[in-house]
Curated annotation (Swiss-Prot):
Lineage: Eukaryota, Metazoa, Chordata, Craniata, Vertebrata
Gene Ontology CC terms: cytoplasm; extracellular space; membrane; nucleus
SRCR domain location: 45-146, 170-283, 308-408, 418-526
Residues recorded with modification 2',4',5'-topaquinone: 671
Cross-link for Lysine tyrosylquinone (Lys-Tyr), residue positions: 635-671
GO MF annotation list: copper ion binding; fibronectin binding; protein-lysine 6-oxidase activity
Organism: Mus musculus
Protein role: Protein-lysine 6-oxidase that mediates the oxidation of peptidyl lysine residues to allysine in target proteins. Catalyzes the post-translational oxidative deamination of peptidyl lysine residues in precursors of elastin and different types of collagens, a prerequisite in the formation of cross-links between collagens and elastin. Required for somite boundary formation by catalyzing oxidation of fibronectin (FN1), enhancing integrin signaling in myofibers and their adhesion to the myotendinous junction (MTJ).
The protein, known as: Lysyl oxidase homolog 3
Family stated for the protein in its record: Belongs to the lysyl oxidase family.
Catalytic reaction list: L-lysyl-[protein] + O2 + H2O = (S)-2-amino-6-oxohexanoyl-[protein] + H2O2 + NH4(+); N(6)-acetyl-L-lysyl-[protein] + O2 + H2O = acetamide + (S)-2-amino-6-oxohexanoyl-[protein] + H2O2
Mutant phenotype after disruption: Perinatal lethality, due to impaired development of the palate shelves and abnormalities in the cartilage primordia of the thoracic vertebrae. Cleft palates and spinal deformities are caused by the decreased collagen cross-links in the palate and spine. In addition, mice display a reduction in the saccular space in the lungs at 18.5 dpc. Lungs also show reduced lung volumes and weights and deformed and smaller thoracic cavities. Excess elastic fibers are detected, possibly due to an increased expression of Loxl4.
Cellular compartments annotated: Secreted, Extracellular space; Cytoplasm; Nucleus
Amino acid sequence: MRAVSVWYCCPWGLLLLHCLCSFSVGSPSPSISPEKKVGSQGLRFRLAGFPRKPYEGRVEIQRAGEWGTICDDDFTLQAAHVLCRELGFTEATGWTHSAKYGPGTGRIWLDNLSCRGTEGSVTECASRGWGNSDCTHDEDAGVICKDQRLPGFSDSNVIEVEHQLQVEEVRLRPAVEWGRRPLPVTEGLVEVRLPEGWSQVCDKGWSAHNSHVVCGMLGFPGEKRVNMAFYRMLAQKKQHSFGLHSVACVGTEAHLSLCSLEFYRANDTTRCSGGNPAVVSCVLGPLYATFTGQKKQQHSKPQGEARVRLKGGAHQGEGRVEVLKAGTWGTVCDRKWDLQAASVVCRELGFGTAREALSGARMGQGMGAIHLSEVRCSGQEPSLWRCPSKNITAEDCSHSQDAGVRCNLPYTGVETKIRLSGGRSRYEGRVEVQIGIPGHLRWGLICGDDWGTLEAMVACRQLGLGYANHGLQETWYWDSGNVTEVVMSGVRCTGSELSLNQCAHHSSHITCKKTGTRFTAGVICSETASDLLLHSALVQETAYIEDRPLHMLYCAAEENCLASSARSANWPYGHRRLLRFSSQIHNLGRADFRPKAGRHSWVWHECHGHYHSMDIFTHYDILTPNGTKVAEGHKASFCLEDTECQEDVSKRYECANFGEQGITVGCWDLYRHDIDCQWIDITDVKPGNYILQVVINPNFEVAESDFTNNAMKCNCKYDGHRIWVHNCHIGDAFSEEANRRFERYPGQTSNQIV
C-alpha cells in the first residue's frame, strides 16, 4: 500500500509563487485508512490557487488521472469538514466560493455537493454525480482548514513550482548604513531575496508603477519621488549585486512577482550596464505617521469622514470590511470578492496592498445592512465606492458571507520589544518588555495593578498572537525566570494601541501596590474571540411602561433591581414604574462567549431558580441628552444560555440543572421583557427627552474581538404617562454626522415619530 505523499505550499512570503498542495490518500500507518477508491479508480486531493496559506485553497480532485474542481453550488461547512480530513487536516474553519483562490482548469468533478460532515470520504456525500455539472470555473469552491494535521499524515514543506526562480521577498535597504535608523524604513534600495541571497534590481526602465507595487507589498499606501542624484553619487562608490532587471508593473499588482520581470543569467558579466540600483521612497499611512512622530503626508489622509472601516480584527490592517452609505455603516458581500478589491480597501485606509481577501465572515459577522455585493475593482480606484458593484437585495447575501481583508503592514519591530515567559504554550505567559537604549537594553516585568483585558489586547497584538483571552494580574502559578525587575506600572490602554509603550504608563517612577514577581502582569492570547451585539430593533419593538405593585417585587428588591428610593417605599403597598423591553444578545464572533468565573464561583439565586455566572453582564441606563445618568437598571446578575441559534448551529449552553453557561457562535441569549429585572426603574424620572442606553459586557470582563459595538442607544420621550422609544441603533452604526443629529434630537411634539 502506498504511503501518503504530500506537496505542501509555501508560507506567505512565497504565496505568490505558482505552487500547489497535493495529497495522496494512502496508509503510512494503521491510523490512516486505506487509499479511497471510486470504482476502480483512486482519488487524490490537493489545494491550489493563490494567495493563500498552506492549509487553505481551491479544492482539486484527481479522478481517472484527471484533475478537476468542485462547484460551490450548495457547498457548506459540512462538506469542507469532509474535504479537509481527506487533505490530512483535523477539520475546516471555513470555506470559499466564486473562485476566491482563482479559477481552476479541467473538469468540474462535483456539483451540488451535500455532506453531513461525518462522512469518511467525499464519495459518501450526495451530489449530481461525477462530472455532471452546469457550473463554470468562476464558481470553484475552496476550503480553509484548521492548521492541525491528522496523525499519520506527513507535514512536508516541499514546494512544487513552475519556474526555478521567483521573487519571494522584497525589502528596502537604506543607502546610509550608519546611525540609528527609525522603523519603519520608508526609503532605500530595492532588494529581492533570491536563492543566492539578497540582490539589487536594475533601474533601467523603472517606473512609478513599479514603486507603487513595491510600496504596497511593504505596507505603504503610496510612493513619492526620490532624489536620484544623491543615490547615483553613492552608486558610483559601491559594488552592487544585481539579480533582476526589466521590471514592468501595471501598478495594480499585489506582489512584485506578478509583474513582468527578468532574472540575470549566472554567467552574465554585463549586469545593468549603465544603470543603477532601483530606489523607492514610500509614503507612510496616517496610523504609522503618528506612531513614528512624523508629520502626516497629504496622501495619507482623505478629506472628511472615512467611508470604509475594518471591524473585528485582532491586528491593525485586518477585519470585516464595512462601508458608509446614507449615514449608516453596513457590510460587503463576499461574492466575487478578490485581492484587487481588498487592496483598494487597504490603500484607502492607509495600509499597503492586501495580503488576503477574506470571505465567509472570517472576521465575524456584522449586523444590519449589507451595502455592496459583487464588487469588481481594477486596483487603481482611490476608494471602494469607485468600483462597479451590484445593487443588493435581501435574497442576495447574508452576513455569513461578509467580506474581510488582511493588509500588508510596515515593519515596525514592536514585536521584538515584548515576550512571554513561563506559560504552557507560546500563547500565554508573564509579560516581559524591553527597555533602555542600544547597548544598554534590558528586560523587565509589568506591575499587575489594574492590568485588564484592554491592556492584554494590546500586548497580544504587539506579540502577533491574535486576541486577548485573559489579562492576568497575578502570575505566580507560572515558572519564574531570571527577569525579576518591574520596569513598567500604571499601564492604561484604550485597546487600539500598536504597542504597550503607546499606552499611558509609569516608567521612571514605578508604583506597584503589590510587590514581587507573583503580582506581575500576564496574558493568555487566542486566535479567535467572541463578539456580542444587541438586536436594537427588538428593544424598540418591545419597550413599554408597567406600573408593578410592590408586593410583586420582593424578589427584585432582593436582587437590587430597583432604584434606591424603593428602599424607603411603603411596602407592600404602592407600585414602581418600570420601563420594560426585551434584550436579544447575539454572538457573531468566532469563539463562544463564556463567563469569566468558573462553575465553582457561580451564585445560586433562589428567587430565579438558577445559578448566575456574571455579576455584571449588561448595564441599562436612562441618560439626558448631555449624557447625565438619571436611572439605571440595577440588574445584578445574569445566567447565560443559548435561547435560539442560526440554521445549522446547535445549542451548547443552558442554565437549567446547573448546566454550562455561555453563548455559542451563531446563537443568541434572549431576556424577555416579562422576566424579573428586565427593566429600568423610572419611578423617579421626570417627563422629558432622554436616551435609553444598553451596554453589554461593560467592564470588559470577558474578551471580545470588538468592544466598540457593545453599546446600543435609542431616543425616547417620556410624558409622565407614556414613552416613545425609537431610532435604536448599535453605538457605532451611524456616521459621525448622524450621531450628532441623534444627540441633538429635540424630542417629540406629538405622537408622530419624526
